[in-house]
């Protein structure tokens, strides 16, 4: 959520900026009307509260002197209903204003390129050289079919479309990838491993920005009166660990990593990537989350992105680093780097990691703060998140980049200790 003072003091300028950089239309007239009404009701409420307080004080003084207070009590009773109604009206209009604020996306940093969509993203760097094959290559679906490793038919029987059953060596490779990533981030990058719930409440999703705007993207479950949601990323669970917390300065930065199942409805995918495992309803991801002081978030963003890059480099997978434009960034992000891995069957790079600095946007929604050691006062933290990386897509990239003419897969050297020394599967 943006700083409310922007809505109150710089509304026209904010609306123009949001339209230009985010393509988001803010109804200025409606918001001005709401704010004007809020001020009117608030002034009226405060006047009545002040009157109540003065009358209550007078009643107390009169009673202490043994005087009759019935007239004063009657005066209080005369406006108490008005005060109660005014307080309710004030709360209602504050809720309306908050609903508007919760739907407004974060503002990009000044160095984020202006653009409408992914075509305006800017490539920052490349690593590795795509392999040249001397045989007809297969995509991951064909490679999986050769050995019965990827079973979409059984998954469809169990759950429907966009699910896959992994069998045998490929299931083992998938597990090895996740374990290897976790070990790297914990042992070499200094992240704390955290095992988090994959079912969360609505407050958690409000905190990180999935609700109320993106509810259609979420799977949910209802038990009695309690509605819960399956996480689309463990960023949700990890980041909300600091919700309503005040963190001492010497504990920052907090760096956490989790390997979890993730669930997405893919409501807006428009039929894209229906073949294979590129876009699934259920998938696994190793997620990185950092919580830091505001002055440290830019450096932390570069560090986190570099940690994700290291995963691809240790696997020997060619990739490129992309700076997202204003129109392609996520709702809560103020700056995002995507990492795209090379897929030989498609002859192109595909997203495998997205690393975002959210500034104080999520922290304000969560009331996540740190205690400034100089002033002694609580201030909003900055939050960052990044895939370190998507496990299923990493498996696809390994299958395709390490395939052999006979349909077997060479196991990357770094994964062999996790697979009892196997150098090849299939």
Swiss-Prot record:
GO terms for biological process: selenocysteine biosynthetic process; seryl-tRNA aminoacylation. CDD domains: SerRS_core. ATP binds at residues 264-266, 351-354. Pathway: Aminoacyl-tRNA biosynthesis; selenocysteinyl-tRNA(Sec) biosynthesis; L-seryl-tRNA(Sec) from L-serine and tRNA(Sec): step 1/1. GO terms for molecular function: ATP binding; serine-tRNA ligase activity. Its EC number is 6.1.1.11. GO terms for cellular component: cytoplasm. L-serine binds at residues 233-235, 287, 387. It is found in: Cytoplasm. Homodimer. The tRNA molecule binds across the dimer. Belongs to the class-II aminoacyl-tRNA synthetase family. Type-1 seryl-tRNA synthetase subfamily. Catalyzes the attachment of serine to tRNA(Ser). Is also able to aminoacylate tRNA(Sec) with serine, to form the misacylated tRNA L-seryl-tRNA(Sec), which will be further converted into selenocysteinyl-tRNA(Sec). This is Serine--tRNA ligase. The gene is serS.
């Amino acid at each position: 959520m943006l700083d409310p003072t922007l809505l109150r003091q710089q509304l026209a300028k904010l609306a123009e900026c949001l339209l230009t950089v985010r393509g988001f239309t803010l109804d200025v007239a409606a918001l001005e009307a709401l704010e004007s009404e809020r001020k009117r009701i608030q002034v009226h409420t405060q006047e009545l509260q002040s009157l109540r307080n003065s009358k209550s004080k007078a009643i107390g003084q009169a009673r202490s002197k043994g005087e009759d207070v019935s007239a004063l009590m009657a005066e209080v009773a005369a406006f108490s209903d008005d005060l109660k109604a005014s307080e309710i009206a004030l709360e209602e209009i504050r809720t309306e204003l908050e609903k508007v604020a919760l739907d407004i996306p974060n503002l990009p940093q000044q160095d984020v390129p202006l653009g409408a969509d992914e075509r305006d993203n800017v490539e920052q760097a490349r690593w590795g050289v795509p392999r040249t094959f001397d045989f007809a290559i297969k995509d991951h679906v064909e490679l999986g079919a050769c050995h019965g490793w990827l079973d979409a038919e059984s998954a469809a029987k169990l759950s429907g479309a966009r699910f896959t059953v992994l069998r045998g060596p490929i299931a083992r490779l998938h597990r090895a990838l996740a374990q290897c990533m976790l070990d790297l981030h914990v042992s070499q990058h200094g992240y704390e491993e955290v095992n988090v719930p994959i079912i969360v409440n609505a407050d958690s999703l409000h905190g990180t920005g999935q609700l109320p705007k993106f509810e259609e993207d979420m799977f949910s479950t209802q038990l009695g009166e309690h509605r819960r949601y399956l996480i689309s990323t463990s960023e949700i669970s990890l980041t909300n660990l600091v919700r309503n917390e005040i963190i001492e300065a010497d504990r920052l930065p907090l760096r956490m990593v989790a390997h979890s199942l993730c669930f997405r409805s893919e409501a807006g995918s428009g039929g894209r990537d229906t073949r294979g495992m590129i876009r699934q309803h259920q998938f696994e991801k190793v997620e990185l989350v950092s919580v830091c002081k505001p002055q440290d978030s830019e450096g932390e963003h570069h560090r986190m992105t570099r940690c994700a890059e290291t995963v691809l480099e240790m696997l020997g997978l060619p990739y490129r680093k992309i700076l997202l434009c204003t129109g392609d960034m996520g709702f809560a992000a103020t700056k995002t780097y995507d990492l795209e891995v090379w897929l030989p069957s498609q002859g192109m790079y595909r997203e495998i990691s997205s690393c975002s600095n959210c500034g104080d946007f999520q922290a304000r929604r969560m009331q996540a703060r740190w205690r400034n050691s100089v002033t002694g006062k609580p201030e909003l933290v900055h939050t960052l998140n990044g895939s370190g990386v998507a496990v299923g897509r990493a498996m696809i990239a390994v299958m395709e980049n390490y395939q052999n003419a006979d349909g077997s897969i060479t196991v990357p050297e770094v994964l062999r200790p996790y697979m009892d020394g196997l150098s090849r599967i299939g």
